[in-house]
Amino acid sequence: MILLIDNYDSFTYNLAQYIGNFAEVQVLRNDDSKLYEEAEKADGLVFSPGPGWPVDAGKMEDMICDFAGKKPILGICLGHQAIAEVFGGKLGLAPKVMHGKQSNINFEAPSVLYQGIEDGHAVMRYHSILIEEMPEDFEVTARSTDDQAIMGIQHKNLPIYGFQYHPESIGTPDGLYSIRNFIEEVVK
């Protein structure tokens, strides 16, 4: 079972539908009293997009700290930013708001999440915050071709991954494959 932590975002159930193609999925809000109990039972954790700054998103950052190294973790948009922040990265406002904007990305490091996906593929972006400084134990897996923003990260030793873009959006045609790869190759 994959536990999808909902950061009060309208895309959460699109993401749940994608995950549900490959595994049982349970959705709980980021402030639900049962989060830790259900996370213990889960095979992997996915932190959804959401509004605002990661530090204000319920129990998300605490959960990332508590489950890092114990459960595979995937963060999307706000979840991606939270992973970076928890591990010592720095966030900042994007020079240009990227709500509903499509970019192409180039891979910078090999990642199991990009298996079967061509370099340069299109992704949909909905963010005004981004990673400015990477955490030491992480590597950049993808950058946007138009503004060189960090679009993908992974921990160097643990099964922890992040996407700044929205794989569940129709504007990310290959997004389903990344979700599949997380579940089939990482969570297993």
Each model region followed by its residue ranges:
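Structural signature of beta-strand start/N-cap positions in the alpha/beta core
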Residues: M1, E24, D43-G44, P72-L74, ...
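Acyltransferase
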Residues: S169-K188
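Catalytic beta-strand/loop cores that center a nucleophilic Ser/Cys/Thr
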Residues: S111-L158
